[in-house]
Curated annotation (Swiss-Prot):
Stated name of the protein: Ferredoxin
Gene3D superfamilies: 3.10.20.30
Cofactor(s) listed in the protein's UniProt record: [2Fe-2S] cluster
UniProt subcellular location: Plastid, Chloroplast
Classification via Pfam families: Fer2
Amino acid sequence: ASYKVKLITPDGPIEFDCPDDVYILDQAEEAGHDLPYSCRAGSCSSCAGKIAGGAVDQTDGNFLDDDQLEEGWVLTCVAYPQSDVTIETHKEAELVG
């Protein structure tokens, strides 16, 4: 399946289709968009975003704790869309405080 992903970036919203077996960060780059990242392995906070709607599978990541996951934090480098999803990007500073 493929889902509509909407990313709310500081430069405005971007939208693209993302298969459910492709990480959102990878698909965003494939679509020509530059997003922040560092490790690409779900073990840092560079690519962190916040889910504004929809659902993702990010079980490949290990940086976020259960509370952060419940609050809607997402690491786009290890997130597969599970529905149409809207994510606010560039949120690392807010996450790590």
